[in-house]
UniProtKB/Swiss-Prot annotation:
Compartment annotation: Cell membrane
Gene name tied to this protein: TRBJ2-7
Claim: Lyase is one of the keywords in the record: no
Keywords: Adaptive immunity, Cell membrane, Immunity, Membrane, Receptor, T cell receptor
UniProt superkingdom: Eukaryota
Protein name per Swiss-Prot or TrEMBL: T cell receptor beta joining 2-7
One CC-aspect GO term: T cell receptor complex
GO biological process assignments: adaptive immune response
Function, in words: J region of the variable domain of T cell receptor (TR) beta chain that participates in the antigen recognition. Alpha-beta T cell receptors are antigen specific receptors which are essential to the immune response and are present on the cell surface of T lymphocytes. Recognize peptide-major histocompatibility (MH) (pMH) complexes that are displayed by antigen presenting cells (APC), a prerequisite for efficient T cell adaptive immunity against pathogens.
Broad class of where this protein is predominantly found: membrane
Oligomer status and interactors: Alpha-beta TR is a heterodimer composed of an alpha and beta chain; disulfide-linked. The alpha-beta TR is associated with the transmembrane signaling CD3 coreceptor proteins to form the TR-CD3 (TcR or TCR). The assembly of alpha-beta TR heterodimers with CD3 occurs in the endoplasmic reticulum where a single alpha-beta TR heterodimer associates with one CD3D-CD3E heterodimer, one CD3G-CD3E heterodimer and one CD247 homodimer forming a stable octameric structure. CD3D-CD3E and CD3G-CD3E heterodimers preferentially associate with TR alpha and TR beta chains, respectively.
Lineage: Eukaryota, Metazoa, Chordata, Craniata, Vertebrata
Length: 15
């Protein structure tokens, strides 16, 4: 899994 940050307050977590 990983986390990808697109900007302040915006986060995508993929297992």
């Amino acid at each position: 899994s990983y986390e990808q940050y697109f900007g302040p307050g915006t986060r995508l977590t993929v297992t």
